[in-house]
């Protein structure tokens, strides 16, 4: 058990009990002009900072944003069979015809899968470029239509000003796809700054505070059949993961039988892994308060490390009520958009762990602010693991008391960075700190079968 993290979460629970005694083909063509398509020539050279003859960065030049490009890459990868078919409870569970179907094992053997990914590239007048991704295709449309015209000509180094201006530029900017688009731009601008100063982003943020970032194994997509769970859980433990998160397969629509399967999953994991591995669970907003509390009361004896998104994130009072009513820590935040939402939850005593995502919540800049807000309440921030680049740099730059751990989606990350030549690698449940400038994302031309680049100066 990680005694520091355990202490953080347990102390936050003690504090709230005294303080509150009663209480997811890319249509960018219509949004911009296509300037390049098909082939891999655009990435024949690695993005690198421009340098003077004395090999020092051109720090005296302004970094005006000249071009914003959205690049969709296409290729293929080989997928391990039998790991992408597990049902996961979700808010649609209440509808019989929309409820996730039970898992069925796929045929043995691997298969070839077509894939695509979108990256954002910003070019500046100083010759320095920033690259970030993969980003959500739907958010890329917002970058293309709404943010690009606003950003062209602005100073890429003026991070605080640009974030605030993007946020104020549209009445819909406070959440959803617009905030996800702000996140993509913000992260790309941090990459530019790191390349400009020739240091990793975590150094710009004040780090490092450690030499590597510990990750927990997030088991989305794996079979929930008992023997498969035992096999997978033990394999992850042997790989060094001291924390494992599993995803609930059933909700209220599956009745008592589904509830017992959810409870059985907890029992199997605790008995399989013993007391030296923490187990966490995610309900992906597919339960309601009563269902969550019934489950909690049945599994408290197995000491889950947290239950995540037990109900819809809009229901702050339900989260607060659950936190008052069970010893199991309450986690949420992947669908938080900005520090204001986090503060409302924390003021209500509704969370033991904040899980904001730097790809969605407002980028690197906003997750740092969220960390400050959470630290005022002695609540740890463990970023949602939709992506790794920004999260690893942020975690490693901040106090372990505030950012103790990261999420590693074991299944997803096997292919999510398919087009990158230097993806972040987990070794013994840790990711070593990158040493290149910025986020140091490099694309592999050999893996890009075709591409489409949309840009408008």
Question: In which residue ranges do the predicted regions lie?
Answer:
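Aromatic- and Gly/Pro-rich amphipathic surface segment
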Residues: 85-116
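Metal-dependent enolase-superfamily TIM-barrel catalytic cores that perform enediolate-based chemistry
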Residues: 212-321, 325-326
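Metal- or metallocofactor-binding catalytic centers and their adjacent structured scaffolds
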Residues: 84, 106-108, 123-196
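Shared catalytic-loop signature of beta/alpha-barrel
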Residues: 101, 297, 303, 314-430
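Conserved, mostly hydrophobic/aromatic
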Residues: 127, 185, 198, 307, ...
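N-terminal secretory signal peptides
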Residues: 1-22
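Flexible C-terminal active-site loop/helix
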Residues: 33, 60-80, 89-98, 365, ...
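N-terminal export leaders
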Residues: 21-43
């Amino acid at each position: 058990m990680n005694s520091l993290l355990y202490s953080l979460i347990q102390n936050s629970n003690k504090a709230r009990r005294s303080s509150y005694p009663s209480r997811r083909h890319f249509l960018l063509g219509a949004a911009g002009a296509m300037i390049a398509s098909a082939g891999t020539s655009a990435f024949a050279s690695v993005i690198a900072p421009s340098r003077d003859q004395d090999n020092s960065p051109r720090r005296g030049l302004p970094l005006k944003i000249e071009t914003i490009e959205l690049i969709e890459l296409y290729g293929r990868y080989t997928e391990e069979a039998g790991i992408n078919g597990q049902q996961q409870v979700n808010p649609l569970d209440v509808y019989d015809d929309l409820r996730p179907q039970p898992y069925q094992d796929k045929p043995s053997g691997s298969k070839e899968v077509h894939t695509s990914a979108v990256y954002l590239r910003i070019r500046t007048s100083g010759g320095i470029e920033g690259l970030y991704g993969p980003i959500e295709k739907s958010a890329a449309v917002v970058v293309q239509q709404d943010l690009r015209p606003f950003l062209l000509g602005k100073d890429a180094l003026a991070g605080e000003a640009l974030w605030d201006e993007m946020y104020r530029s549209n009445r819909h900017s406070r959440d959803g796809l617009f905030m996800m688009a702000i996140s993509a731009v913000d992260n790309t601008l941090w990459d530019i700054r790191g390349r400009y100063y020739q240091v990793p982003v975590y150094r710009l943020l004040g780090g490092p505070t450690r030499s590597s970032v510990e990750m927990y194994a997030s088991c989305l997509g794996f079979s929930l059949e008992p023997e498969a769970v035992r096999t997978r859980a033990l394999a992850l433990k042997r790989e060094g993961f001291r924390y494992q998160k599993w995803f609930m397969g059933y909700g209220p629509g599956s009745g008592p039988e589904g509830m017992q399967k959810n409870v059985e999953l907890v029992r199997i994991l605790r008995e399989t892994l013993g007391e030296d591995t923490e187990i966490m669970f995610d309900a992906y907003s597919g339960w309601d308060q009563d269902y969550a509390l019934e489950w909690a009361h049945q599994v408290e004896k197995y000491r889950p490390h947290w239950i995540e998104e037990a109900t819809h994130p809009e229901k702050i009072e339900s989260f607060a009520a659950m936190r008052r009513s069970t010893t199991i820590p309450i986690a949420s935040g992947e669908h938080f958009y900005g520090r204001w939402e986090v503060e409302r939850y924390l003021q209500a005593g509704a969370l033991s762990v904040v899980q904001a995502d730097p790809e969605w919540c407002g980028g690197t800049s906003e997750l740092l602010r969220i960390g400050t807000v959470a630290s005022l309440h002695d609540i740890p921030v463990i970023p949602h693991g939709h992506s790794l680049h920004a999260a690893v740099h942020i975690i490693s730059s901040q106090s372990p008391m505030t950012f103790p751990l990261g999420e590693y989606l074991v299944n997803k990350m096997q292919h999510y960075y398919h087009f990158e030549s230097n993806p972040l690698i987990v070794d013994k449940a840790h990711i070593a700190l990158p040493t290149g400038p910025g986020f140091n994302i490099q694309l592999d031309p050999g893996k890009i079968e075709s591409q489409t680049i949309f840009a408008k100066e």
